[in-house]
C-alpha cells in the first residue's frame, strides 16, 4: 500500500491554517517528498512522520513557495541520524539552487545526489534501498522551468510454486527471486526470477502536476492515474484571466484534465491566498469530474494494490 500525506496545500505565501506546497509519499517505509515549501517540517512534526527515511526529494520548480523549506529540512534529516545519500530531483537550475541554499546547512552527514532536468523515465537505487518505483517527468508551462512528476509503484508478481518446482529452483532462493533479484548463480547453475513468478500485476500510478497552464501533454502523462494531485490556484471560473496571466489553473481546468486523463481521483491543492474556503468552489470541479477532493493540510489517504 501507498500512503499519501498532503503536508501543505497553500500557494504564494503561508497562512495560519495552510502551509506551503509539500506532499509526502510513503511506500514500504521509505519516503518521497514532492516540493518543500515553508512549514513542511512543522507539518511533518505534527503528523509524526519522522525525517530519517526520506530518500528522494522532487522539486517541481524554483519558486519560494515550493523550495524555501529545503535547507532546514536537510539539516533536520541530518540530525535524525541519517547517513545514507539523498537524491534531489528538479528542473534546470536545481543544482545551483541547492548549493546556494546549503549556505545555512553546509555540513551534512550524508551525500546529496542531484538529478537536474531529467528527461526519461528512471528508477533510483540507493545502496540496498530500492523503492521499486519508476519516476517520469513532464515539462510544464509556468513562469519558470517547472516539471510534473509521475510515480509508478510496481507490484511484485505472484509466486508460482508449481513453476518453481518444475524449474527445480532450490527453495532457499525462492524468496530472493520473487523479490526481483534477477539472476542468482548457485552451484554453477543460473536461476532467474521468471523461473518462480507468474504474470506481472498492475501497480499504482500517482501523478502530481502543479504551477502550470493545462497543456495537452498533461493528459497523456497522467493517463489512467490511480491518484492525480493537481494545482487549483483559482476556485472561481471568473478568475480564468488571472490563471492565464499567472500561468496557473482554475478548479474547472484541473477537473477537465482529470476527466480527459481518465484518472480515478483528483486531489486539488496549491490554493491561492485569496481563497479562504476552497470547499466553496468544489462544485466548479465536480460539474466536470465528480471524483474531486479538496485538499487541506495533513489530508491523508491510502492507496491499495488491487487484489488479483
Swiss-Prot record:
Cofactor names: Zn(2+)
Any one GO MF annotation of this record: zinc ion binding
EC number(s) from the headed UniProt entry: 3.1.26.11
Catalytic residues (positions): 65
Reactions it catalyzes: Endonucleolytic cleavage of RNA, removing extra 3' nucleotides from tRNA precursor, generating 3' termini of tRNAs. A 3'-hydroxy group is left at the tRNA terminus and a 5'-phosphoryl group is left at the trailer molecule
Cofactor note: Binds 2 Zn(2+) ions.
Positions bound to Zn(2+) 2: 65-66, 211, 270
Residues given in the record as Zn(2+) 1 binding sites: 61, 63, 142, 211
InterPro entries (UniProt xref): Metallo-B-lactamas (IPR001279), RibonucZ/Hydroxyglut_hydro (IPR036866), RNase_Z/BN (IPR013471)
UniProt cross-references to Pfam families, sorted A to Z: Lactamase_B
Keywords linked to the UniProt accession: Endonuclease, Hydrolase, Metal-binding, Nuclease, tRNA processing, Zinc
CDD domains linked: RNaseZ_ZiPD-like_MBL-fold
UniProt-listed Gene3D superfamilies: Ribonuclease Z/Hydroxyacylglutathione hydrolase-like
Function: Zinc phosphodiesterase, which displays some tRNA 3'-processing endonuclease activity. Probably involved in tRNA maturation, by removing a 3'-trailer from precursor tRNA.
Annotated NCBIfam families: PRK00055.1-3, RNase_Z
Assigned protein family: Belongs to the RNase Z family.
Binding partners and assembly: Homodimer.
Protein name: Ribonuclease Z
Phylogenetic lineage: Bacteria, Bacillati, Bacillota, Clostridia, Eubacteriales
